């Protein structure tokens, strides 16, 4: 199988999965990332993308995340299409994290390729980051800014064929309408390293 992973900070949540698939020696695997000097995996071709656009420092707060995410999405999609043109690699499946917008435009380049998206978090005023981090105090704009950050997963729920969330708590933060596509699949804990004494 031809598999393309997409994550700005390779390998992200996919370290064990990528390693396991590569060890099978039965797949052609590409990993598309922005990370400089990412870890190397035998049997995995690492390729890089550059964001198409970064918002200005003083960009409008409600749209800043969307602007950055669509810049990532266009940069990743263009890089993926260039890989197909120059290297002849068109994946049978794309796997990636939706949080930074990287998967947003993959159906525009490969409408027939299934996409599995990792849905990590949906923002709301309560039970999440609002008021949690002292570095980001709650203001009268906090509810609007948190909701605006949801534009990326809202766009991507229609882009992906299947979505994964690592826990039921995370999945349940998303609107009920997402649940038809979201499956809970834990992304792993290294029990050989993280366990009670």
Regions found by a protein language model. Name each.
Residues 53-63, 113-151, 192-197:
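Acceptor-binding helix/loop patch of EC 2.4 sugar-transfer enzymes
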Residues 35-44, 107-109, 173-177:
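Short loop/helix-cap segments at secondary-structure boundaries that form the rim of catalytic
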Residues 1-45, 164:
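N-terminal subdomain of nucleotide-sugar transferases
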Residues 31-83, 87:
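A conserved catalytic-core segment of Leloir-type glycosyltransferases
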Residues 87, 155-156:
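Structural alpha-helical scaffold elements that stabilize or flank donor/cofactor-binding regions
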Residues 169, 188:
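Carbohydrate-associated surface elements
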């Amino acid at each position: 199988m031809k598999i393309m992973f997409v994550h700005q900070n390779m390998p992200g949540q996919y370290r064990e999965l990528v390693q396991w698939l590569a060890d099978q020696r039965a797949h052609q695997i590409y990993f598309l990332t922005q990370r400089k000097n990412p870890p190397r995996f035998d049997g995995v071709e690492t390729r890089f993308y550059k964001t198409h656009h970064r918002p200005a420092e003083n960009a409008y707060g409600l749209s800043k995340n969307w602007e950055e995410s669509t810049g990532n999405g266009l940069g990743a999609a263009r890089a993926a299409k260039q890989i197909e043109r120059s290297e002849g690699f068109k994946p049978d499946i794309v796997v990636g994290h939706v949080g930074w917008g990287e998967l947003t435009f993959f159906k525009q380049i490969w409408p027939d390729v299934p996409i599995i998206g990792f849905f990590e978090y949906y923002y709301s005023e309560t039970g999440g980051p609002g008021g949690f981090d002292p570095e980001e105090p709650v203001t009268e704009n906090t509810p609007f800014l948190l909701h605006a950050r949801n534009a990326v997963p809202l766009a991507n729920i229609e882009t992906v064929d299947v979505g994964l969330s690592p826990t039921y708590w995370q999945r349940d933060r998303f609107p009920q309408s997402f649940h038809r596509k979201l499956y809970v699949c834990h992304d792993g804990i290294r029990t050989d390293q993280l366990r009670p004494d």
